Amino acid sequence: MNVTTTRKDLMIVNMGPHHPSMHGVLRLILTLDGEDVIDCEPILGYLHRGMEKIAENRTVIQYLPYVTRWDYLATMFTEAITINGPEQLGNIQVPKRASYIRIIMLELSRIASHLLWLGPFMADIGAQTPFFYIFRERELVYDLFEAATGMRMMHNYFRIGGVAADLPYGWIDKCLDFCDYFLTAVSEYQKLITRNPIFLERVEGVGIIGGEEAINWGLSGPMLRASGIEWDLRKVDRYECYGELDWEIRWQKEGDSLARYLVRMSEMTESIKIIQQALEGIPGGPYENLEIRCFDREKDPEWDGFEYRFISKKPSPTFELPKQELYVRVEAPKGELGIFLIGDQSGFPWRWKIRPPGFINLQILPQLVKRMKLADIMTILGSIDIIMGEVDR
């Protein structure tokens, strides 16, 4: 009598780039032994558009509409990093009111990004209801953006020396009303999700990253803070006016997918706290500074050495980047978003290197999914929170 034996061959499966859980055009080549993942190889580059090379052929103002296509769910942060570099190179003083407006916009953008992380993350692991709920609050954030900037996404709002336009009449009251409402919405999400036994079964103890391991991999943002490291660039660098506001770094020590979920949920409430303080303490005065102080320049005898130069808000190449190099960074929703900028005394940057948080956070994925089940890939990838626009650039 012949006994049929089960085949033990390994199976190679392509996940993506057209998979609904890939959050864009990511492709994973998986080696499976039954349902166990033996190996995982991410294939990137499907959304590569040459963003760094484009920057070398544009003035800073001309380049602003391009940068909102990196992380297209948190566009205020890409705009902030794009103008922070030239501002620091040119020693441009940003008015206090403009700095407060920037903080408000950045934190609203962080909330919108975390909301659109939460919905698909829950849908990936089988919970459909939160996916529809998050769009209520996200629409309110986009209504605020539309009232202030004219655009719901891709705002093109930040400018060298300030912002493009002041806040419209009644906007501050509208934003304060949103803050009060949003806190009740977050508590509703937590009742719905956080203690749900099926949700906990899917995320608890899945994709564990230790603190030292997170540092060695160069992780940042919620990925790092969920592993027990209290590191937030808003506290470390104190850029804009974050040092004047009272808020806390939210972190967890477990390092699993649940910890990353908890960090992002609590970050949304901290963002509301920051926005409320900024709205109540926003000073008067100008919302832009269009003068650049010219230090370290030889006096031009023909013009008697003007100490100031005018920054044009139009795309004309009037703002020259000094011959220096600089690394500047902000705390984006996904982690540390930075650019390395080299100027050469012209209107165009000589080098514009982007440090995208999603690209670096994604590197740890193959290690996290090994020896896990195939279904856990969705949980782990969702907890990393990637946007392929900034990964591929």
UniProtKB/Swiss-Prot annotation:
**GO-annotated cellular components:** chloroplast thylakoid membrane
Q: Which reaction does it catalyse?
A: a plastoquinone + NADH + (n+1) H(+)(in) = a plastoquinol + NAD(+) + n H(+)(out); a plastoquinone + NADPH + (n+1) H(+)(in) = a plastoquinol + NADP(+) + n H(+)(out)
Q: Where in the cell is it found?
A: Plastid, Chloroplast thylakoid membrane
Going by the UniProt record, its keywords in alphabetical order are: Chloroplast, Membrane, NAD, NADP, Plastid, Plastoquinone, Quinone, Thylakoid, Translocase, Transport
- Protein EC: 7.1.1.-
Give the record's GO biological process terms.
photosynthesis, light reaction
Pfam family, any one: Complex1_49kDa
* Classification via InterPro entries: NADH_Q_OxRdtase_suD, NADH_UbQ_OxRdtase_49kDa_CS, NDH1_su_D/H, NiFe-Hase_large
Membrane topology, as annotated, equals:
Peripheral membrane protein
Transport is among the record's keywords: yes
Gene Ontology MF annotations: NAD binding; oxidoreductase activity, acting on NAD(P)H, quinone or similar compound as acceptor; quinone binding
Note the Gene3D superfamilies from the entry.
Answer: Cytochrome-c3 Hydrogenase, chain B
Q: Which residues form a coiled coil?
A: none
**Family note:** Belongs to the complex I 49 kDa subunit family.
> Its biological function?
NDH shuttles electrons from NAD(P)H:plastoquinone, via FMN and iron-sulfur (Fe-S) centers, to quinones in the photosynthetic chain and possibly in a chloroplast respiratory chain. The immediate electron acceptor for the enzyme in this species is believed to be plastoquinone. Couples the redox reaction to proton translocation, and thus conserves the redox energy in a proton gradient.
* Complex formation: NDH is composed of at least 16 different subunits, 5 of which are encoded in the nucleus.
The protein, known as:
NAD(P)H-quinone oxidoreductase subunit H, chloroplastic
Recorded source organism is: Oenothera biennis
What would be the name of the gene that encodes this protein?
ndhH
